[in-house]
């Protein structure tokens, strides 16, 4: 398995939500969509991971969903969950957004997947283009909690312009022709649980594969990020889900 997919796949073992948003917060987003959308809508999730957003949406409504993700392991887990929780309601494709038709949806989402769409602004343009007028976009993106200093940026290995502050992120959503309706920010303890679960999974994998060079590489990568997270990321990085209506 490619190191990139292996790192993500192993790190997310046992996790259904592939970002630091808590389960209650995801539920609040689903409730907002269900109560303000049509009774039988269609939802698209690009970079859907294990499709938890789509599954919850279809569990609680008459909606149907389509998700796409390039990670074969995530696709398999998503399909298994759909078979028991939302059979026949959600379709998952293994691949990228390039493979999708130009159909539009009542909801288009990308949670932490803007990199797959060329960055924040191109991702928002793609989501707006995939959403019917009056429909919803759900956009998950990282942001700076406060302006980053040079020392923290060096620890994280990130340029200052890679992310914006939360108000700048919301303004970018607004500028894409989308009316922000709700912003849900990952709580610190949910992010901690996410990070440490990810770390435990990779540590367990390295322990159970002592002679595997890939396992050693993945664990070394995780140790580097653990250090960066504790020294700078925990204080500086935020993650938000933004629900917006297409104008």
Positions of the model-derived regions?
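Conserved alpha-helix/loop element of class I SAM-dependent methyltransferases that forms part
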Residues: 19-39
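Class I SAM-dependent methyltransferase SAM/SAH-binding core
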Residues: 44, 50-98
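A short acidic, Gly/Pro-enriched loop at the edge of an enzyme's catalytic core
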Residues: 98-108
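Short, glycine-/aromatic-enriched active-site segment of Class I SAM-dependent methyltransferases
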Residues: 142-160
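Short alpha-helix
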Residues: 162-177
């Amino acid at each position: 398995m490619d190191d990139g997919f292996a790192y993500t796949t192993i790190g997310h073992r046992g996790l259904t939500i592939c970002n630091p948003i808590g389960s209650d917060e995801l539920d609040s987003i689903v409730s907002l969509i269900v109560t303000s959308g049509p009774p039988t809508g269609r939802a698209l999730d690009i970079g859907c991971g294990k499709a938890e957003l789509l599954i919850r949406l279809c569990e609680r409504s008459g909606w149907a969903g389509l998700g796409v993700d390039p990670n074969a392991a995530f696709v398999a887990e998503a399909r298994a969950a759909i078979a028991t929780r939302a059979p026949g309601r959600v379709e998952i494709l293994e691949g990228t957004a390039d493979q999708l038709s130009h159909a539009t949806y009542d909801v288009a989402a990308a949670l932490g997947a803007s990199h797959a769409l060329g960055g924040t602004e191109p991702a928002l343009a793609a989501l707006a283009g995939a959403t019917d007028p009056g429909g919803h976009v759900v956009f998950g993106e990282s942001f700076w909690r406060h302006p980053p200093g040079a020392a923290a940026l060096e620890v994280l290995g990130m340029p200052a312009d890679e992310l914006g502050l939360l108000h700048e992120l919301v303004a970018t959503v607004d500028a894409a022709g989308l009316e922000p309706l709700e912003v849900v920010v990952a709580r610190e303890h949910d992010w901690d649980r996410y990070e440490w679960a990810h770390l435990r999974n990779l540590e367990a994998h390295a322990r159970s594969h002592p002679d595997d060079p890939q396992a050693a590489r993945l664990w070394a990568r995780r140790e580097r990020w653990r250090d960066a997270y504790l020294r700078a990321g925990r204080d500086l990085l935020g993650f938000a889900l933004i629900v917006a209506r297409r104008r």
